[in-house]
Amino acid sequence: MPSDAPSSLASTRNIGIMAHIDAGKTTTTERILFYTGVNYKIGEVHEGGATMDWMEQEQERGITITSAATTCIWRDHTINIIDTPGHVDFTVEVERSLRVLDGAVAVFDAVAGVEPQSETVWKQADRYNVPRIAFVNKMDRVGAEFHRCVDMMVERLDATPAVIQLPWGVESDFRGVIDLIRMKGLLWKSEDKGASYEVVDIPRDHLEAAQEWRDKLLETVAENDDELMELYLEGEEPSEEQLMAGLRRGTLASKINPVLCGSAFKNKGVQPMLDAVVDFLPNPLDIGATIGHSVSDEDAEVRREPSEDEPFSALAFKIMSDPYVGKLTYIRVYSGRLTGGSPVLNSTKDRKERIGRILQMHANHREDRDGVGAGQIVAVVGLKNTTTGDTLCDPNAPVILESMTFPAPVIHVAIEPKTKADQQKLGTAIQRLAEEDPTFQVRTDEETGQTIIAGMGELHLDVLVDRMRREYGVEANVGKPQVAYRETIRRKVEKVDYTHKKQTGGSGQYARVIINLEPSGGDGGGYEFENKVTGGRIPREYIPSVDAGCQEAMEFGVLAGYPLVDVKVTLLDGQYHDVDSSELAFKIAGSMAFKDAARKADPVLLEPLMAVEVTTPEDHMGDVIGDLNSRRGQIQAMEERGGSRIVRAQVPLSEMFGYVGDLRSKTSGRASYSMQFDSYAEVPGNVAKEIIAKARGE
């Protein structure tokens, strides 16, 4: 951080910039860095020169893959910005950055409006209760419609937009914005790349609309703020300060979302958006105490106030490998103060760690810091055992902060090294990448011995394989993408009795267990284990072994060897032998009892369903719908948007491979689509038979 940076909590903002792919998010961040004086040359995404997109693949693909954290100063406030990816395959990046942010700027495309990934990200932000302002970008583009975008925020996001700016002109005539708080026009100058703008009176032909929208603004804010409601009912006009204060209170309470507009690419509207970040988004003090729990008791609540006088606590939200300094762990400090070289406790794993260096990150260059206090986001070097979602804290005042939830992968491929020399490197690369990305999973196929990598989509795995090649020099052959099917059960089976016995001279093995198995009604990741054994029929030290055996059996289902999910095991009874019983014997008994029970419990196959949205010209509508139906798709909605037709459907992932090429040829390249994981559902009988036969090699 620059040495003159204000460090007080009240003047700190930790924000994310979130949006759909291509809404102009990275360009917006670049402009922020330019106007706050961090960059001297503006980087353009389509030239591959954006500061935030610093990985090679991002510069080639023009999309943001990892959320880089950058610090800048505006109006004597420190703004820590996390640039998040908008592509659905990288949802994990958005999820983890929202957990550590205090506020966010949602960037929308004025032409496309609220797109599917915008909805996903908005709902993620709702879940973490992150206050947001909205920036309607690309106002200079043909087909830009500000008001339709605002309407879509209401319809699709269930938001309460408080419009504080109107566009001045539209498309190629877009010149600036009309500020409804100050009732002034703002015009940008092109000669200094939009670094300065003129404040002018609102032109006559815009005055009526401005007055009408200002009245709407006052009404929206008053409806969500008691203080302004009183003024409103008395017919009094609030002062600029009162209106700003009401907007801030409403935004912090997540009741309203101030909406601004502009064109980041054309350098218009970025500074007022930065003003809105400072004026309306929360500082760490507004967010208040972070709630965690005691290390010894999950139900015992522990509070950590955002103050440097409190004991140190922080959350590790991202791991990255840096070619120069090694493993970087990004942390958000919630309380206390951290200095370089100090010992900390990783309370999640109960391991002591030592902080080496503390680094303030600017997209891809870094600055050493001696220490860092509550409310800041930095990267630290020297942590050996810390992974995403772990809590770091003062060893004398342990606490575990709320972690993050990550979706399970939906697609997997087999990967093998091209040469013997690549074998070792592949292992290292996979281990490092799995450390960085919790949604990237690795396992070995027991039958074929192949290494299987799994992720959130084809692009996700492409990028990971690409990184193996570039960063670790691994040349690998990658198989065809396979769908991550799962299995579950449909009915309860009771008192399944299994005895594991092996008594052939010497010490034998003996364990008997009796279990119930039933569906747990979860949504894809559920497993419950309940122990109802009484009277010491199975000694207490063997109970975890039965649980472990059941969990091991779940990894390979009874139908086709896919993981079994959403089950509850109840251990009812059993027997042990003084000499021959062991942890291993009970683990095997648990595993075999589970498999027996699963076979009897009406097992079924589950497949991932994707929410697909296709944008197509009207004359290709029939072809698109026919094609989706042929892929076992269920059409859920159709609507018109700016001369195009939108088809929303739910389609099994297994039917979507190669869809991009088929859609192109059916619509002469005029249609586009986006898809994201929706849910798991039962595979129809005839299709399931084929999948099971294939998995069994029949």
UniProtKB/Swiss-Prot annotation:
Any GO MF annotation of the entry: translation elongation factor activity
HAMAP family: EF_G_EF_2_B
Binding positions (GTP): 19-26, 83-87, 137-140
Keyword Transferase: no
Location, primary (coarse class): cytoplasm
UniProt KW keywords: Cytoplasm, Elongation factor, GTP-binding, Nucleotide-binding, Protein biosynthesis
Known role: Catalyzes the GTP-dependent ribosomal translocation step during translation elongation. During this step, the ribosome changes from the pre-translocational (PRE) to the post-translocational (POST) state as the newly formed A-site-bound peptidyl-tRNA and P-site-bound deacylated tRNA move to the P and E sites, respectively. Catalyzes the coordinated movement of the two tRNA molecules, the mRNA and conformational changes in the ribosome.
GO biological process, one term: ribosome disassembly
Residue span(s) of domain tr-type G: 10-285
Name of this chain's protein: Elongation factor G
Family: Belongs to the TRAFAC class translation factor GTPase superfamily. Classic translation factor GTPase family. EF-G/EF-2 subfamily.
SMART domains cross-referenced by the UniProt entry: EFG_C, EFG_IV
GO cellular component, one term: cytoplasm
UniProt-annotated location(s): Cytoplasm
Pfam families tied to this protein: EF-G_D2 (PF22042), EFG_C (PF00679), EFG_III (PF14492), EFG_IV (PF03764), GTP_EFTU (PF00009)
InterPro entries in UniProt: EF-G-like_DII (IPR053905), EFG_II (IPR041095), EFG_III (IPR009022), EFG_III/V (IPR035647), EFG_IV (IPR047872), EFG_V (IPR035649), EFG_V-like (IPR000640), G_TR_CS (IPR031157)
